[in-house]
C-alpha cells in the first residue's frame, strides 16, 4: 500500500507533468510502444550543455584545489575540445571515444566535448587494470581513448596494440596544459559541430562484470536527456 508520502509525490508529479504544466509530457514511439517524454526537454545533450552553461554563466562550477572554472569557462573549454576532436583527431558522428581517467576537471570537459563533437563517450572503469581496459576498448570498437597517464601506462604494460589510438593526458596539470594534446595550437574557428538528434548515441557504460566480462551498454541522447529531466521532476 502506498504511503502518504508516496501519494503526495505522485500528485505533485501529476501536476508538474499535466498538459500546460512546466514539465508536460508528450509521447515518443519506440520499441512498439508510446513512451512518455518531457516535452520541453532538448533533443540532445549538446543543446542542454549550451543552455545550462549560458544560464549560469560566471557562476563557479568546477572546484579542484586552487583551480576554479565557471560554467561559461567550462563550456568554452568543452567547445574547444569538441572542435579539436573533429578537426585534429577525425572524430566522426557515432564514433566510440573512450575516457579512462580519475576524477578531474579534464574528465568533465572531455565528456562534454566528446558528446558535442558527435562522439559516443565510452566511460572506461578507472579501477580496471590493463587487460580489462583493453578488453573494454575492443568490445565497443573505440577509435580513440583519452587517458590519464596511469591508465595509459596500464595499457602500455599489457602491450595494447588494438585499433584504438591512445592519447595520454597529464590531468594534474593546469587545464590548458592538461588538454594540450587534444587541442594543440590549431585555429579551430572554422569547425562546424554536428547537429545532433535524440537518436544519436551519447554514452556507453559497462556492466558490472560480476558473472563474466563487462559489456558495454549504450544510451542515446534522448535517453540521457530524459533521464536528467525525470530527475528534475522528482
Regions from the PLM with identified roles:
Residues 97, 114, 145, 201, ...:
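Conserved S/T- and glycine-rich ATP-binding loop of Class I adenylate-forming
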Residues 150-198:
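ANL superfamily adenylate-forming
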Residues 70-72, 202-229:
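Conserved AMP-binding A3 loop
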Residues 2-20, 39-61:
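A short N-terminal helical cap/helix-turn-helix that marks the beginning
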Residues 128-157, 227-234:
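Conserved ATP-dependent adenylate/AMP-binding module captured primarily in the ANL superfamily
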Residues 37-41, 50, 58-92, 96-112, ...:
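Conserved AMP-binding/adenylate-forming core of the ANL superfamily
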Amino acid at each position: 500500500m502506498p504511503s502518504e508520502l508516496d501519494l503526495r509525490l505522485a500528485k505533485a508529479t501529476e501536476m508538474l507533468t499535466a498538459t500546460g504544466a512546466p514539465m508536460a509530457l508528450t509521447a515518443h514511439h519506440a520499441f512498439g510502444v508510446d513512451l512518455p517524454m518531457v516535452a520541453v526537454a532538448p533533443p540532445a545533450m549538446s543543446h542542454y550543455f549550451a543552455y545550462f552553461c549560458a544560464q549560469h554563466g560566471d557562476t563557479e562550477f568546477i572546484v579542484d584545489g586552487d583551480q576554479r572554472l565557471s560554467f561559461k569557462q567550462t563550456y568554452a573549454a568543452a567547445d574547444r575540445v569538441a572542435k579539436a576532436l573533429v578537426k585534429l583527431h577525425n572524430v566522426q558522428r557515432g564514433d566510440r571515444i573512450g575516457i579512462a581517467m580519475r576524477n578531474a576537471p579534464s574528465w568533465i570537459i572531455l565528456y562534454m566535448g566528446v558528446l558535442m563533437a558527435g562522439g559516443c563517450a565510452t566511460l572506461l572503469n578507472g579501477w580496471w587494470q590493463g587487460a580489462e581496459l583493453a578488453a573494454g576498448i575492443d568490445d565497443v570498437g573505440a577509435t580513440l581513448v583519452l587517458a590519464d597517464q596511469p591508465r595509459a601506462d596500464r595499457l602500455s604494460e599489457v602491450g595494447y596494440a588494438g585499433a584504438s589510438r591512445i592519447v595520454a593526458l597529464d590531468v594534474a596539470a593546469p587545464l590548458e596544459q592538461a588538454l594540450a594534446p587534444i587541442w594543440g595550437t590549431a585555429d579551430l574557428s572554422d569547425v562546424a559541430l554536428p547537429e545532433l538528434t535524440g537518436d544519436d548515441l551519447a554514452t556507453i557504460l559497462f556492466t558490472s562484470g560480476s558473472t563474466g566480462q563487462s559489456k558495454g551498454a549504450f544510451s542515446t541522447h534522448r535517453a540521457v536527456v530524459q533521464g536528467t529531466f525525470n530527475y528534475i521532476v522528482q
